[in-house]
Regions:
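Context-gated lysine
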Residues: 24, 33-36, 54, 109, ...
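Charged, surface-exposed interaction regions in soluble eukaryotic proteins
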Residues: 127-184, 193-198
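Alpha-helical oligomerization segments
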Residues: 171-228
Length: 228
């Protein structure tokens, strides 16, 4: 693993920080007023779904309406992205993340420039940190993005609500694309995740970057629905 990280750090990258100025967030009847903007944070994602929504109200709704409410709540927010996954997807992810808890994600900034995030799963949360900082000291690396899986409604609806909270180092479009890259490489094209964790010496970073799906010009970043 360390050899794979060392090779990544020797790759030419460019880091572009684009802070975002928060706008007023529209209230929703089923959501809490727990709005916060964090240019830097120790743990960005709410630990429980009840910190985000009024769960007692939301759980009464049918699955289709739950999707709508979840996406409507996050659409105007400039500190988080969200999507909804099915239970089968999350079950497959649970097994793979246990065997392959870490992976690297290039954040593409155009003109061939990018910087790398290293992601590490901790139970139902995935923390994304700047790779250079992580390599120096993982315990002190600042999180740029944290993805949380909320499975409170899984048994009744078959849905898992997914939310990614990000710092001012990322734009909303960046965060939405990284969230979808995570889904792509853990569900659709897992060979890169498997190689990175199990055979790090064989991980070809240049080939990997060439294989990374590029974000479309127009992204439904509010709901985190970039489809490859």
């Amino acid at each position: 693993m360390l050899r794979a990280l060392s090779r990544l750090l020797s790759t030419t990258t460019a880091s572009v920080h684009l802070p975002i100025v928060p706008e007023k967030v529209v209230d929703h009847a089923y959501t809490t007023k727990n709005y916060k903007w964090m240019p830097g944070f120790s743990f960005p994602a709410p630990r429980s779904l009840e910190q985000v929504v009024k769960l007692a109200l939301l759980e009464r709704e049918p699955p289709a309406r739950i999707r709508e409410i979840w996406n409507e709540h996050h659409a105007p927010r400039l500190d988080s992205v969200a999507t909804v996954w099915g239970g089968e997807e999350v079950a497959a992810l649970a097994e793979r993340r246990r065997r392959c808890p870490r992976f690297v994600y290039p954040v593409l900034k155009g003109d061939g420039k990018f910087f790398n995030l290293i992601a590490e799963w901790q139970d139902k949360f995935c923390i994304f940190s700047y790779l250079d900082d992580y390599r120096k000291d993982p315990s002190r690396a600042e999180p740029y993005l944290s993805v949380a899986l909320y499975d409170d409604l899984l048994a009744r609806t078959g849905l898992v609500l997914v939310r990614g909270d990000f710092s001012g180092h990322l734009t909303k479009r960046d965060a939405a694309h990284v969230l979808n890259l995570m889904r792509h490489f853990y569900f659709v094209e897992p060979k890169w995740v498997e190689t990175f964790n199990k055979e790090p010496a064989a991980f070809d970073f240049s080939a990997f970057v060439a294989a990374v799906p590029r974000p479309p010009e127009k992204t439904d970043a509010a709901a985190g629905k970039v489809l490859f």
